[in-house]
Amino acid sequence: MENLFIFLFALLLFCFMLLKLSKKYSALKLPPGPRPLPIIGNLHQIGGGLMHHILREMARTYGPLFRIKFGQVSTIVVSSPEIAKEIFRTHDVVFSYRPQNIAVFNVMTYNFSNIAFAPYGNYWRQMRKICVMEILGASRVRSFGSIRQEEVMNLIRFVGSHKGKLVNVSEKIYGLTYSITARAAFGKVSKYQQVFKEHMDKYDDLARGLDIADFYPSMKFLRLVTGMERKLKVMFKEVDEILQVIIDEHRDQRMKKIRSKVDDNEKEEEEGNEDIVDVLMNLQQSGQTELPVTDDNIKAVILDIFGAGGDTTAATLEWALAESLKNKQVLKRAQEELRTIFHSKRNVDESGFNQLKYLPAIVKETLRLHPPAPLSLPRECSEECNIYGYDIPAKTRVMVNIWAMGRDPKYWSEPEEFKPERFIDSRIDYKGNDFEYIPFGAGRRICPGMSFAIPNVALPLAQLLFHFDWKVDDDAGKLEDLDMVEHPVLEARRKNELKLIPVIYEGSCLKN
């Protein structure tokens, strides 16, 4: 009898709280949106297609700001530059928070001590400043130039050695961006580099899968049912062990240098060639940061670097090459520019990049049509606010459809066409001030890795277009027939790999 009374009391209390919450929301002017079903919300409406495509279609029905429910999670979707500006500039502080109950980020961020998902506050400000000023600043990115050049030339030589044969260019591109990132992070080629890549590939495969438990934060038992968190923890343990070994090796090397009393000139030379782990360990040991930098903080930032500099960069490079090859006039103009400017060198290097106009426009146009993340990483409203005349309750998540805004005919002529010339002599840039074009996001949470990513796209693209003319296999038709189908993953890579036949250009240094 007592148990029955407790049960009835709990049920009445639950109903009372539900009624109170319902009355509170009914008093608000909420954004429009599709009617959610009990329990599942609108989950049934997002299956069977690419999320950013589905959300664009919904925006055509419900407007540039609409509300949708993923299970228990209320989310607003933004598809307009004007509203994105309200989110990222007017109310930037309110929307600078990240949701803290997504399985993949719970596990793989060292208790949210990375930059992408750290809670907005002193720690996040410190780590972002370190990232922008110390790790991925202009001078540091330039210092990685020799790594880029060497790794890209390795790729070019490999492709050249397979002239006339079918090459899986996509596979080589993904290997290239990983190698550049790994050497920038760890220094010389590490004996753990390949096994680390294998683990990161497995992690990426897991991270791309939706965990239904993320949509029901109050139902903790679902974590056990889906098993996603358990799998992630196993993977995380393996990745963590490799990263700790790499940090310990760096620490041992530093101690050896101290004991050997390296002279000042030698120190200066080495400091110019520091890798990212070195930079973070310098800050760790200096004691000059407001908050201590732990080994776990270093590992979290390294995983961030791989997230920004690995697959997303490779996907952009892959799209840029595919779009250039598919569009005959774009290919002709790009190759003419490159082969004129670098004719005497018979090779491309970054010292001549300031003379290029069309190649940077190709990169910008690729980012418009194929942004690295078609939907912005989720943010969370820290307090109730008003956006576009609608009330947004606290804890509401927000996603910005960056992909849709880059294809909006209101802001772009012939938005579905690949036209790099639209960016020549244009002041529109990807640095977060032009809200119709924010491939790296905007506001306080803008991606700090853009300065690292852009050269890692531009140099290999330039080399691949300079050194080779390209053909497809006879069964695949012509270059103009290349498909542009997206893979349904977060970074929107190509669904089908680029498999091409290289023909070495007569003016290339590869031609003996």
Swiss-Prot record:
Signal peptide segment: 1-24
User: Which top EC class is named for this enzyme in its record?
Assistant: oxidoreductase
Keyword presence, Signal: yes
Which residues have a glycan attached per UniProt? 111, 168
Q: Name one GO biological process term.
A: alkaloid biosynthetic process
The UniProt GO MF terms for this protein read: heme binding; iron ion binding; monooxygenase activity; oxidoreductase activity, acting on paired donors, with incorporation or reduction of molecular oxygen
Q: This protein's superkingdom?
A: Eukaryota
Tell me which residues bind heme: 447
| InterPro entries according to UniProt | Cyt_P450, Cyt_P450_CS, Cyt_P450_E_grp-I, Cyt_P450_sf
Name the CDD domains for this protein. CYP71-like
Give the UniProt keywords, A-Z.
Answer: Glycoprotein, Heme, Iron, Metal-binding, Monooxygenase, Oxidoreductase, Signal
Which PROSITE patterns does this one have? Answer: CYTOCHROME_P450
Q: What EC number is given for this enzyme?
A: 1.14.-.-
Q: Kindly give the Pfam families that the UniProt entry links to this protein.
A: p450
Return the similarity comment.
Answer: Belongs to the cytochrome P450 family.
Q: What is this protein called?
A: Cytochrome P450 71BT1
Report the source organism. Answer: Catharanthus roseus (Madagascar periwinkle)
The record lists the lineage as: Eukaryota, Viridiplantae, Streptophyta, Embryophyta, Tracheophyta
Q: Which gene encodes it?
A: CYP71BT1
